[in-house]
Every structure is written in structure tokens, then in C-alpha cells.
Curated annotation (Swiss-Prot):
UniProt-annotated stretches for the region Disordered: 1-65
Domain of life: Bacteria
Record's compositionally biased regions (Basic residues): 1-11, 21-43
GO biological process: translation
MF (Gene Ontology): structural constituent of ribosome
Organism (species): Desulfovibrio desulfuricans (strain ATCC 27774 / DSM 6949 / MB)
Protein name, entry field: Large ribosomal subunit protein bL35
Family per similarity comment: Belongs to the bacterial ribosomal protein bL35 family.
Gene this protein is translated from: rpmI
Amino acid sequence: MPKIKTRRSAAKRFSQTGSGKFKRRRQNLRHILTKKAASRKMRLGQSTTVDKANEKAVRRMLPNG
């Protein structure tokens, strides 16, 4: 059996926490920032966890954690 390869694009976007959940960055903080409120931009700057519905797919893309 060949080794299971990690999807490198997913490895750059997600990181696993100590409890086994996956951290990700929020969207909408790249451009067109002038119309967004400062409070919204601060909230978007914080990382969040991957939803339960998507966690299985992320886990499959990152077999080695």
C-alpha cells in the first residue's frame, strides 16, 4: 500500500487543535474593507473552528493531522 498523502492546500488552511478540532481563518478580510465596520473586521480577524458538517471532509484531507 502506498502512503496516504496530505492535501497540501488543506494543510495550509487548517490546523488541528489539541482536542482534535480544526482551526480555520474567517473569510471576507482580503479586500473591500473600507465599507466594513471596525468591529466586524476585528471579529473576522479571529480564527474559528470548522463546523461539524465539514469536519469529516477536512479530516479526510489531512490524514496525518
